[in-house]
Amino acid sequence: MAQFDLTRINCQYLDRHLTFPLLEFLCGKEIYNQQELLEYILETVNKTNMIDYTMDTRKRLNLSQEMPDELVQRKAEVLATLKQLQNEVAPIMKATDILKNGESMKDSKTFVNALQKDYNFKVEHLESAYKLAKYLYECGNYQESTSYLYFCLIVMSPNDKNYLNVLWGKLAAEILTLNWNTALEDLTRLRDYIDSANFSTIQALQQRTWLIHWSVLVFFNHPKGRDLIIEMFLYKPLYLNAIQTMCPHIMRYLATAVVINRTRRNALKDLIKVIQQESYTYRDPITEFLECLYVNFDFEGARLKLHECQTVILNDFFIVACLNEFVEDARLMIFETFCRIHQCITISMLADKLNMKPNEAECWIVNLIRNARLNAKIDSKLGHVVMGTQPLSPYQQLVEKIDSLSMRSEHLAGLIERKSKQKNQESIDSWKYY
């Protein structure tokens, strides 16, 4: 289903190294022409220093089994540059190895003072470490790159011209090495920096748009990600505004997170509002499934859309691992919504709504009742399911109230901050006339 594939759009907001897993994933699908896809990968990898990956892609395109002279020369140049940069940084990294187990490593200022006092540390060394980290990253050596990027973060001032680049580079490298705990820490650090930095409105919007796309990779791979993506995308006004303004297609991932997160059903009401607001700019089977179910109460439409959702998720790199969970939870949502309307339901009718055979549907409902997730009884003789009352728990009501208040508080804080900035700007401008 090429019409629902978001790879082309998502790649516009990702570092080229982060696009490779997405492109390789597509190679295993039959959405696009394989030859054209490999040619695009080759074109992209040629802009990096990953010579072995370039050669491997050439072989897959049947261009040559031997490395061309141009690549041989380029590989030699890359290795020479790498060695030179490593030699420049070697003395200071040796000192870091000595100090890393001591108390000085815990505090940035103490660490820098120790380097300056005992190892003649200079600004040039920091610049060299930054260049080496970037070069290692371009070579595809992400693990080693993270070590130098971490060093830069400890030593570098937040006012340094390269500090923001280091934050982005560290996050990318941790994602590519699948270090999800560290990646989440780096994501939080980068978000805090962007939110507090003195960017123009356009710059801040651009930075948040990029961060939103990168964060999807982290959120769907971290155990806490399903809660955090809802908090950031739905309940942080600055990021919700960025999604609505720049990238409404991200609604797919927010909607998926809400569907597969049974503890956050309270977010459905707010999500549906946003989906309806953005339906004129973005729609796909996942958002349409929720509209069918919770806006139109169209169970037949929801059933058909759920079938389309499976194809969409199967071909989306970000959420493919959630396929089985999504289908299971989506069926549960159909079932719960249907049960609110009908107190007594035939198993055959439910099976039809859930895209299941009657005996499968009966087993599925029995398991729900057995696991205490459903207040219902089955009349096997008549083939009926009789529903009991299912009140909203006090905990869910409390969470819903807190989320609502949190969102309103953050919105008010944003308004006050903008008013304050505007007032300060007017005060500064008034001095121009004196």
Curated annotation (Swiss-Prot):
It comes from Drosophila virilis (Fruit fly). It comes from the Eukaryota. Component of the eukaryotic translation initiation factor 3 (eIF-3) complex. The eIF-3 complex interacts with pix. Interacts with mxt. Keywords: Cytoplasm, Initiation factor, Protein biosynthesis. Component of the eukaryotic translation initiation factor 3 (eIF-3) complex, which is involved in protein synthesis of a specialized repertoire of mRNAs and, together with other initiation factors, stimulates binding of mRNA and methionyl-tRNAi to the 40S ribosome. The eIF-3 complex specifically targets and initiates translation of a subset of mRNAs involved in cell proliferation. The keyword Cytoplasm applies. GO terms for molecular function: translation initiation factor activity. SMART domains: eIF3_N, PINT. SUPFAM superfamilies: Winged helix' DNA-binding domain. Its main location: cytoplasm. It is found in: Cytoplasm. GO terms for biological process: formation of cytoplasmic translation initiation complex. InterPro entries: eIF3e, eIF3e_N, PCI_dom, WH_DNA-bd_sf. This is Eukaryotic translation initiation factor 3 subunit E. Residues 219-392 form the PCI domain. GO terms for cellular component: eukaryotic 43S preinitiation complex; eukaryotic 48S preinitiation complex; eukaryotic translation initiation factor 3 complex, eIF3e; intracellular membrane-bounded organelle. Belongs to the eIF-3 subunit E family.
